[in-house]
A protein has these predicted regions:
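Acidic, surface-exposed loops and disordered segments
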Residues: 1-173
Length: 173
């Protein structure tokens, strides 16, 4: 059985090379809207998406993420858009809720021909004083946990084919 959604799921790949051009507002809004329709525990919608396209803010996030990683590289791969996904730290299912948002963002991006990749270490970034100050600067008050960064842009290269699925991936009982 196949359909467009299943094909998008099977063909989505993490993109780690981006063209410098910014994505359009129409593309961005479509990806963001898909993120807001992610399933959430009891419909609480505990996640929040922060759009970062400003060069200074992108550089700050890149530096903070690299510091957590212990490297002096660009963990955002030069992507022109970073979507920071946060979740209410007091929500019982904050991490699953935010993770579903991340999945929707990446699948929506793939459906539009955009590249995306989940970049880790958001939790550690926003546990720091600098991270908490950044949230306040963005007007985000309260207790939030960083779920991930969904980087977006136009792919600079074609994606590699998927690796074969491991034979014991599924167990039917």
């Amino acid at each position: 059985m196949t359909n467009e959604t299943l094909e998008t799921i099977k063909n989505r790949r993490s993109c780690r090379a981006y063209k410098p051009e910014q994505i359009t507002n129409e593309e961005l809004d479509a990806v963001l809207e898909a993120g807001t329709y992610a399933a959430s525990a009891m419909g609480r919608q505990s996640a929040k998406i922060v759009v970062v396209q400003d060069a200074t803010a992108r550089a700050q996030l890149t530096r903070m993420n690299a510091a957590v990683m212990g490297r002096d590289t660009d963990p955002m791969y030069g992507a022109p858009t970073i979507l920071v996904v946060l979740a209410d730290a007091h929500a019982p299912n904050a991490v699953p809720d935010g993770s579903l948002v991340m999945g929707n963002l990446m699948l929506a991006a793939a459906s539009l021909g955009l590249g995306s990749c989940w970049i880790n270490r958001a939790k550690e970034e926003f546990e720091t004083e600098e991270g908490k100050a950044l949230l306040r600067q963005w007007g985000i008050e309260g207790d939030w946990v960083g779920i991930g960064h969904c980087i977006l842009g136009y792919p600079a290269a074609d994606p590699k084919p998927a690796a074969p699925r491991k034979p014991d991936y599924i167990v039917k009982v």
